[in-house]
């Protein structure tokens, strides 16, 4: 009987891989984002290829449609914050959409992940400072007062993210319930 309890206990504590949507500045941070995808801790959307992105960018409606389609069925949006992420209009759209849709939303600074050719970069601004809640009891508040951003250890950003990203995502999802 004890063996069954232990098996049941193990099943109860098994973590599931969440389906997430990554939001980031493609040109500057795609290599850093790829490091996070390769950790294998969570299941994320596949990035659009540079050629496909160039086609999509020709019309705002094409980009919006791609974002809306790829964000559907995701439980959380993970904003990977680099030097210029907070200035990117499509990142701000993704943040606003995630909040309006009731998805988990979390920010992780990635400036200390090493890019193969350029190394680390400087930290960017918090993109949640640039998005204001449009309705509900939090109307008028900046999302930076409602959404957690994590700044991994400078000395070992990769392993800090790998060890904690699952918990950060779970906390973001729980905060929206």
Region locations from a protein language model:
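Conserved nucleotide-binding/hydrolysis micro-motifs of P-loop NTPases
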Residues: 27-29, 112-115
